[in-house]
From Swiss-Prot:
The gene is rpl40e. It comes from Methanothrix thermoacetophila (strain DSM 6194 / JCM 14653 / NBRC 101360 / PT). This is Large ribosomal subunit protein eL40. One of its GO terms (cellular component) is ribosome. SUPFAM superfamilies: Zn-binding ribosomal proteins (SSF57829). It comes from the Archaea. GO terms for biological process: translation.
Length: 48
């Protein structure tokens, strides 16, 4: 997908808050903006 594996890791290895859609660090347990605990991994497959 990305040209460099470092860039791909930086873009895809994040967690997404299911309430406010904020990007959070991979080690997060709750959202940095709204403190919601429902986080999911960012989808690695393209949706097209």
């Amino acid at each position: 997908m990305a040209r460099f594996s470092e860039a791909e890791n930086r873009v895809l290895n994040v967690k997404i808050c299911m309430r406010c859609n904020a990007r959070n660090p991979i080690r997060a347990t709750r959202c940095r903006k709204c403190r919601y605990k429902g986080l999911r991994m960012k989808s690695k497959e393209s949706r097209g």
